[in-house]
Amino acid sequence: MLARTAAIRSLSRTLINSTKAARPAAAALASTRRLASTKAQPTEVSSILEERIKGVSDEANLNETGRVLAVGDGIARVFGLNNIQAEELVEFSSGVKGMALNLEPGQVGIVLFGSDRLVKEGELVKRTGNIVDVPVGPGLLGRVVDALGNPIDGKGPIDAAGRSRAQVKAPGILPRRSVHEPVQTGLKAVDALVPIGRGQRELIIGDRQTGKTAVALDTILNQKRWNNGSDESKKLYCVYVAVGQKRSTVAQLVQTLEQHDAMKYSIIVAATASEAAPLQYLAPFTAASIGEWFRDNGKHALIVYDDLSKQAVAYRQLSLLLRRPPGREAYPGDVFYLHSRLLERAAKLSEKEGSGSLTALPVIETQGGDVSAYIPTNVISITDGQIFLEAELFYKGIRPAINVGLSVSRVGSAAQVKALKQVAGSLKLFLAQYREVAAFAQFGSDLDASTKQTLVRGERLTQLLKQNQYSPLATEEQVPLIYAGVNGHLDGIELSRIGEFESSFLSYLKSNHNELLTEIREKGELSKELLASLKSATESFVATF
């Protein structure tokens, strides 16, 4: 009996021991199966890697560093970096820099500022603790910089007054005041019909190759007459940002500014077509920060965004690669906010804030003249008016090819030079009547005298508004020309001789009535006596022409 009991106990111990031995094997098998099933689910890749990385002894702090899970198309997905901020700069161990755009559970989506070929899977990524910031101050004048504010013109380091974040909040309602000072472009068609004020956002919109950049460039060149002086309140510093353009185009622009002695008061921010999409997305914000330094220090600046269509395309590319939900035309839902937060930074500040201003001239490229597309309508609704350039007018030789009917300035009339407002008041009405009559005149030759008169004057006014590139006119030169056109002094002159009349009339005034031009420039308005003198001078010249 005792022998039987001992045998049963021995068998029990053997079974218990074998069960204990089997448990780890079963657990290992289950773990293997679970791992296999996990591999089949890509969404859990980050958690698997997290477990593995945690298993490595003394791995660097995951709050401050991370490891690359995957890289491609200029996007790196990184595990770790638990304490990272949105839009913070990071540095890869290969030396490439990037910016955190997507903060997701378990991983961070980082856009790369350099080539993604240099970044490898498993590579270490470190936080820098810095949100994207750029150098600002007068030391940038005459320089060409990239989207991060680094000099690319070979003229050595920049003597910056400080650094500013690329993306900052726009001024609120109380620090602003209404637009009341003019930005003179030197273009008769713009200054007379769609005037721009300091602190305004005026959109330049049109198809490719219709002269959009030419309008902006002439505006920059026209500021030379004030920037060469010593009156800081009249100076207008210019910032030009090239987004997605050819490098040869940017080089040509710099050369043009240098030839006309305009580079000394200008800053070029370039994110060319060959550069990464994140840099094209960032460049306008960098330029805005550079311009804001002048605004916030009681000075005046003009910023040209050329063009925001390409910035929207770059942002769409980034958003789709980061797997953000697409909306209309595959743009992300916040593309409106992209442009509104940028353009709201243009403002005229109150006296309490220093009376500085930042004026924006955003450029938008349309396809086939379609201004009702997504991005054009967005920017039209954000801005204070638009200058619409038409391919049809451009090919007819009417340059600048401004469609006067579709172009408007919603706040600029309050800032228009009074003398120009006095003579150009009826110009828009004459041109509107001319367009209406010209459409019907094609179908019939039987026209009454008043219709013929409208056609004659409209043709001459259209011809008068033509202007060669790089030849901006001062206000005191524009006023007599528009006065002559609106008051019918050109009606008897042949259409082909209007250009000749323009140059001869200005030469005549400078030689014989220079005090008249000086008075218009200094007073800025036409008194009764000045108007009588202008009428007399115009009539005497037309009689001899």
Curated annotation (Swiss-Prot):
Example GO molecular function: ATP binding
GO biological process, one term: proton motive force-driven ATP synthesis
The entry's keywords: ATP synthesis, ATP-binding, CF(1), Hydrogen ion transport, Ion transport, Membrane, Mitochondrion, Mitochondrion inner membrane, Nucleotide-binding, Phosphoprotein, Transit peptide, Transport
SUPFAM superfamilies: C-terminal domain of alpha and beta subunits of F1 ATP synthase, N-terminal domain of alpha and beta subunits of F1 ATP synthase, P-loop containing nucleoside triphosphate hydrolases
Signal sequence, start to end: none
Transit peptide segment: 1-35
Matching PROSITE patterns: ATPASE_ALPHA_BETA
Positions where Phosphoserine occurs in the chain: 57, 178
Residues under site feature: Required for activity: 407
Subunit comment: F-type ATPases have 2 components, CF(1) - the catalytic core - and CF(0) - the membrane proton channel. CF(1) has five subunits: alpha(3), beta(3), gamma(1), delta(1), epsilon(1). CF(0) has three main subunits: a, b and c.
Family membership: Belongs to the ATPase alpha/beta chains family.
HAMAP family named in the record: ATP_synth_alpha_bact
Descriptive protein name: ATP synthase subunit alpha, mitochondrial
Organism expressing this protein natively: Saccharomyces cerevisiae (strain ATCC 204508 / S288c)
